[in-house]
Amino acid sequence: MSKIVKVLGREIIDSRGNPTVEAEVHLEGGFVGMAAAPSGASTGSREALELRDGDKARFLGKGVLKAIEAVNGPIAEALVGKDAKDQAAIDAVMIELDGTENKSKFGANAILAVSLANAKAAAAAKGMPLYEHIAELNGTAGQFSMPLPMMNIINGGEHADNNVDIQEFMIQPVGAATLKEAVRMGAEVFHNLAKVLKSKGYNTAVGDEGGFAPNLKSNAEALEVIAEAVAAAGYELGKDVTLAMDCAASEFFDKEAGIYNMKGEGKTFTSEEFNHYLAGLVEQFPIVSIEDGLDESDWDGFAHQTQLLGDKIQLVGDDLFVTNTKILAEGIEKGIANSILIKFNQIGSLTETLAAIKMAKDAGYTAVISHRSGETEDATIADLAVGTAAGQIKTGSMSRSDRVAKYNQLIRIEEALGERAPFNGLKEVKGQA
């Protein structure tokens, strides 16, 4: 009953108004899975390739008809008749058929959409929720947890049209007893932040991930206004709510000069100086997690950063590791960072994503499941976070349906699982247990 009878691809629109790939996988017995590929703005150079058409007369070159042709043509032909329950085999067929190191023939956007749609179809055929099916694929059947959210409530960098260099300033509602309570706390801080920003004469328009995107005097001011909002919401900073940042430092790294150029603040730093700048912020504010604190190629700098901060806080590799087990293995061996950001479309299949999560956990690294800045209503990452018991999730702020869809799915899952899926809060963050 889980044999694939049809694979279908279509071009849909993501949260930034750009096309993306949506796929359907149909099985015997009428079971159907549907999934869409997300898309990033600040991307690591070693990510799997997102195939775009390049036809400037259509969607300004961002069309995905070539990827759709791959889904409806060679991918569909290769998968019809295969057993959808064997996810590893399904993904292996597509990867082998593509035949490139970075999935550039069909596009990671094509392969991923089919991979996730297949998992959803298989879950339907088994009569179980997607998170339960993912747990079985992961070899951890019946082991679930609700993730601690990192809520991106001030957007900067590539995610906003403002003068803030650091890309994301996030809150973690660590004082919550449940995921649902964490979402409520996040929403309350978010609304209070709007009031704080308005009182200072700042803009309250939102960026790509639903966080506010004001022009600020400094990166430290972003943390200061969040601290005010946390207090205004009736919570204690450092106890009820902790802070996290995604520097996305590759975006302001001048490769030729070898310096970090923070134009918003009018400052430049060497690797070592920037590490000490971050350490200063960690001393000043209850920051428990920093992502991509240096350029993806600055491994010597990351080694220094890990020595400086790795025992105190979580250091997450996003552009650094790009959900790739080969790169992660090298990072583990060299003691670089202590956590990995997990993005499906950086690697391009569910099987490879699960392998990256397992490798991280086996090495004592944490895994943070993440959205992309270009999203859809697809909430698969919520099921991935619960089904792998990853412990943490990054899926934007408390506005924009493309972000809130994931929180709402987590609320539903928590309701269904009850005590079978504990919410462990701050214990999930590396260095904070």
From Swiss-Prot:
It catalyses: (2R)-2-phosphoglycerate = phosphoenolpyruvate + H2O. (2R)-2-phosphoglycerate binds at residues 167, 343, 372-373, 394. CDD domains: enolase (cd03313). Pathway: Carbohydrate degradation; glycolysis; pyruvate from D-glyceraldehyde 3-phosphate: step 4/5. The active site is at 209 (proton donor), 343 (proton acceptor). It is found in: Cytoplasm; Cell outer membrane; Secreted; Cell surface. Mg(2+) binds at residues 246, 291, 318. Its cofactor is Mg(2+). One of its GO terms (molecular function) is magnesium ion binding. PROSITE patterns: ENOLASE. Binds a second Mg(2+) ion via substrate during catalysis. The keyword Secreted applies. Keywords: Cell adhesion, Cell outer membrane, Cytoplasm, Glycolysis, Lyase, Magnesium, Membrane, Metal-binding, Secreted. Its EC number is 4.2.1.11. SUPFAM superfamilies: Enolase C-terminal domain-like, Enolase N-terminal domain-like. GO terms for cellular component: cell outer membrane; cell surface; extracellular region; phosphopyruvate hydratase complex. Gene3D superfamilies: Enolase-like C-terminal domain, Enolase-like, N-terminal domain. GO terms for biological process: cell adhesion; glycolytic process. Component of the RNA degradosome, a multiprotein complex involved in RNA processing and mRNA degradation. Catalyzes the reversible conversion of 2-phosphoglycerate (2-PG) into phosphoenolpyruvate (PEP). It is essential for the degradation of carbohydrates via glycolysis. Belongs to the enolase family. Pathogens have evolved a strategy to activate host plasminogen and manipulate plasmin activity for their benefit; plasminogen binding (even without its activation to plasmin) increases their adherence to host cells. Plasmin activity leads to degradation of host extracellular matrix proteins like collagen, fibronectin and laminin, facilitating bacterial dissemination and disease spread. Enolase 'moonlights' as a plasminogen-binding protein. This is Enolase. It comes from Vibrio parahaemolyticus serotype O3:K6 (strain RIMD 2210633).
